[in-house]
Amino acid sequence: MNAHPNLSRPIRSLLRLIPIVTASFLGLLAQPPVVAGEASEARLPTIDPDYCGVTFPPNIAPLDFRIQEPGLSFEIRIAGAAGTPVEIFSRKPQVVVPIKPWRALLEANRGQPITIQVAAMRETGELDRFAVITNFVAPEPIDGFLVYRRLNWQFARYANGSIGIYQRNLADFQETELVRIKERNADNRGTCVNCHTFLKNQPDVMALHARVGTTGEKPMIIANKGTITTVAKPFGLLAWHPSGHLLAFSQNMFSMILHSVGRNRDVYDGAGDIGIYTLASETVTMPPKISLPDRFETWPTWSPDGKYLYFCSGPKLPVQQYQEIKYDLMRIAFDEASGAWGDVEEVLSSKTTGLSIAEPRISPDGNHLLFCMFPYSSFPGTQPESDLYLMDLRTKKYQRLDAVNSNRSECWHSWSSNGRWFVFSSKRRDGLLTRPYFSYFDSQGQAHKPFLLPQKDPADFYDSLPQMINLPELVTGPVPYGQRTWFKAMFAPEHRVVPKQSGETSDAPASMGEPGSPMN
């Protein structure tokens, strides 16, 4: 029977919604519960994720969170100096912020603080108000999309057939599969998608390393403004030259070292050399200065002006001495017009730091270099001690980013195109699974407290997702290539290139380890 026979269906629906959530800009008359009294807490409320004291961009999705305080119901008020506050009355601890008023509030408060007031209704009928959370809206936006890899953790990596490259619209919660490998499909068995990289944050110029289970090939797939090329040579870690004419790559042979007690695993790279792939001539060159027979070279990255190639280099020791291998940060001058290389320079020595160095990434203005340091090896993902460091390339001074790091592994970082944001993967949430975090990098060269990639009900999303999210790369728009494009390039390429060898070469093997094994 109709409980409200004299009311229209839209009005009846509205009445059911009003007690739960409302935003004040809507003009809906929602009344919070009647309370017997109020009390004030001197402390901040405990919320998950920890969105307290963070700086976020004006174009980020709502920072939904869960209140980890007892209460029969909750009141939340999000406000700034300008614009209309967002008010939410909820019977559940999950706080879902309406996206339209959230966007309007952030836009009205660029460069200004945003406060969050949380109150909990106790069983006594008393409303307990916590101290106000103060965050800050940066004036500069972040690139609109994030591209990352999702894969199952460690030994169950192919459960539910999950390894793939995804993109996420940072202004909302839309995630899109770019390519997903379903291992339970016999045609895909043994197939893997791995390192991906973009040319200066452009979504339509990218390279992707793959392994094709049916053929055993490990090609690099280049998507360049709609043209798809499958390069039939095993490349590892990739880096675009700023001109877009070249790709630096590493040749690696990763193997897993498993332990029965203590640290559960390590990664050993048994073959590290760096080479150059030239797109126009379809040639591969292994410059002798960066493919030395007695050194492991890896983690190539270019300076924004293209005049230097930065990389990491460590002594070539046998696997039994894996804990003794520490990598130095190096660079070498390069002239694109002539193809000439300068001499290798040491930028930062592991003997000076006492730590191994990996994953150098330079800010778009060329002034700062973000990198990882940890006790040994070239792989920070398996090292809980891995932290992010920042070097001022103008002075060569470096510092540990105390505001950013945790007591868990930090790695896989990349810059936004405007240099005001960087994203990285961290295991701080549970010690096992990498999750993407963002940090604001202000005009004074200071990195701010990071925040977790927003999700609808993020506590439930991250706690129930048994996958690592790593290799996060910021891009300025949506990637225009989907599943069909990548599968065709892997299994039935229209444009397949067998690159010609040019100049002196290294004899080091060129293969990656098991798909996803060390890539965490």
What are the functions of these language-model segments?
Residues 2-19:
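Bacterial N-terminal signal peptides that target proteins for export
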Residues 31-520:
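Sequence signature of WD/YWTD-type beta-propeller architectures
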Residues 16-28:
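Bacterial N-terminal signal peptides
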Residues 5, 25, 29-32:
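Short stretches within intrinsically disordered, low-complexity N-terminal or propeptide regions
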